């Protein structure tokens, strides 16, 4: 089988707002409806889309963008178990706050090597600490190892690992802020993420 499709989107292309994940998940959903009787769950579609992104398009990415698009809405996703991420849908409880995307005209299409460096450098830190990924490293062990790490990896790699640990804590706080409709706490967390 096959299909012919025409698509139209308001998602900005190449601006860092998951446009490729949107397209990949769209194709996965079309195939799901046409050939799978709509039996595939969101995470399975996200994994297929992630495969297309990383293998076919050669973009070194994680599963976040595809999962968020496939799930829709606001979700708390824990990727500790990458085979079956833990997903919790969260109601957006802010009547006075909207999420707005602004097209700044930026383009990250030629930044693949820079994105690849993020993962590569964090994995370098993890390997030195005895694991393949930072999610397996305890935060305490990481911070205690900074003097030794600084002799083996770049300062940027250490800062990226610090961001990893801090960002994971921030995500938990963001989810709590959304559940409690605390706009102040939520924006503090978002700003902290951007500053990091």
Model segments located where?
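Gly/Ser-rich oxyanion-binding loop with an adjacent helix/lid
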Residues: 1-92
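C-terminal nucleotide
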Residues: 76-196
């Amino acid at each position: 089988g096959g299909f012919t499709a025409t698509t139209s989107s308001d998602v900005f292309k190449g601006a860092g707002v998951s446009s490729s994940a949107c397209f990949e998940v769209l194709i996965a959903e079309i195939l799901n409806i046409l050939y799978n009787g709509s039996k595939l769950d969101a995470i399975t579609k996200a994994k297929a889309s992630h495969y297309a992104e990383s293998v076919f398009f050669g973009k070194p990415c994680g599963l976040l963008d595809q999962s968020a698009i496939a799930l829709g809405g606001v979700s708390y996703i824990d990727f500790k178990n990458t085979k079956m991420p833990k997903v919790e849908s969260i109601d957006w409880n802010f009547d006075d706050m909207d999420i707005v995307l602004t097209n700044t005209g930026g383009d990250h299409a030629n930044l693949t090597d820079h994105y690849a460096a993020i993962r590569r450098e964090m994995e370098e830190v993890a390997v030195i600490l005895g694991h393949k990924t930072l999610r397996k490293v305890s935060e305490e062990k990481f911070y205690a190892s900074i003097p030794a790490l600084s002799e083996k990896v770049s300062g940027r790699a250490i800062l990226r690992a610090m961001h990893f640990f801090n960002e994971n804590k921030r995500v938990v706080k963001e989810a709590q802020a959304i559940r409690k409709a605390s706009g102040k706490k939520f924006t503090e967390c978002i700003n902290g993420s951007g500053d990091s």
